[in-house]
Amino acid sequence: MESLFPAPFWEVLYGSPLQGNLSLLSPNHSLLPPHLLLNASHGAFLPLGLKVTIVGLYLAVCVGGLLGNCLVMYVILRHTKMKTATNIYIFNLALADTAVLLTLPFQGTDVLLGFWPFGNALCKAVIAIDYYNMFTSAFTLTAMSVDRYVAICHPIRALDVRTSSKAQAVNVAIWALASIVGVPVAIMGSAQVEDEEIECLVEIPAPQDYWGPVFAVCIFLFSFVIPVLIISVCYSLMVRRLRGVRLLSGSREKDRNLRRITRLVLVVVAVFVGCWTPVQVFVLVQGLGVQPGSETAVAVLRFCTALGYVNSCLNPILYAFLDENFKACFRKFCCAPTRRREMQVSDRVRSIAKDVALACKTSETVPRPA
């Protein structure tokens, strides 16, 4: 069957699929999951320097992102005061990011070698995690924005709606919705021999030239466009509300916290949109039949794809800078060993001082010989 796109473009752009974060069609009509765009098999030449740069970026993002997101989850689980509705959603976001970051060493190896060496089971797992991350991240940010809208625009109703238990239920629903896509692609994904090299592919059902574009457009709409539209509506209503009143609650401190948390969620959403828009636009344009015609354009596409992964390690940094509670908990965690050592030294000094004082007192009470 004839490819939907010109062969030279696919020979340059594709090899093994494992990179990127938007769905496309490969020459054999296999649908690639979102983060799985960039590689260099099918005989395409990928300069070693570019390979090393991409792999180095992946490893840096993996290490930094895992440390940050694991710390976020630990802080939320460890401290009771951190178990708010907003932080429950943040935990879900960190969990999804942690899962996808764990796939980066495998995807980096795939980039470096130019083929998939890890077998069928791991291929299915990586594909499923990519789709789960894409949908759970978008849905969680949407839920956070709706949660902020309720807190700002309907403060009375928020007392009943915005509870940690209900936020946990929403998180479960988000993963269930993501399973509508995640489970089927895991079933359809497999490591196959394509052009004498092993590729990790998602085989779409026949007729591929119909279901491929339909699937790609649906992924684009439901994982990006619709969530961004809902988020935009929520924040538009919140801005109008915030401009219309001086105090949202009876307390200036509570009002300050509401605005601070709303600003945090807005920044997290903005960074998500900023990181994902470039690759989403690239893939949408390709879906409309316009392909990059230069090596520079292909290189830009590769790094736009990597930018999607960078988003997964930025969120903990945003929490540390924009949320006082997270900042305090992070500082407490990082300074704990030093503080323990200082306390041990202080206790030792006090013990020595006490012994010296006792010795001096004893010497004063002992009668001196005449």
Swiss-Prot record:
It is a multi-pass membrane protein. Phosphorylation at Ser-363 requires GRK3. It is found in: Cell membrane; Cytoplasmic vesicle. Residues 1-48, 110-124, 189-211, 286-300 are extracellular. Glycans are attached at residues 21, 28, 39. The chain crosses the membrane at residues 49-74, 88-109, 125-146, 166-188, 212-236, 265-285, 301-322. Keywords: Behavior, Cell membrane, Cytoplasmic vesicle, Disulfide bond, G-protein coupled receptor, Glycoprotein, Lipoprotein, Membrane, Palmitate, Phosphoprotein, Receptor, Transducer, Transmembrane, Transmembrane helix. It holds the Pfam family 7tm_1. The record marks 110, 130 as: Important for G protein-mediated signaling. Detected in brain cortex, stomach, ileum, jejunum and colon. Its main location: membrane. A lipid is attached at residue 334 (S-palmitoyl cysteine). The keyword Membrane applies. Disulfide bonds join 123-200. One of its GO terms (cellular component) is neuron projection. Residues 75-87, 147-165, 237-264, 323-370 are cytoplasmic. GO terms for biological process: adenylate cyclase-inhibiting G protein-coupled receptor signaling pathway; neuropeptide signaling pathway; sensory perception of pain. One of its GO terms (molecular function) is G protein-coupled receptor activity. Belongs to the G-protein coupled receptor 1 family. G-protein coupled opioid receptor that functions as a receptor for the endogenous neuropeptide nociceptin. Ligand binding causes a conformation change that triggers signaling via guanine nucleotide-binding proteins (G proteins) and modulates the activity of down-stream effectors. Signaling via G proteins mediates inhibition of adenylate cyclase activity and calcium channel activity. Arrestins modulate signaling via G proteins and mediate the activation of alternative signaling pathways that lead to the activation of MAP kinases. This is Nociceptin receptor. It comes from Sus scrofa (Pig). The gene is OPRL1.
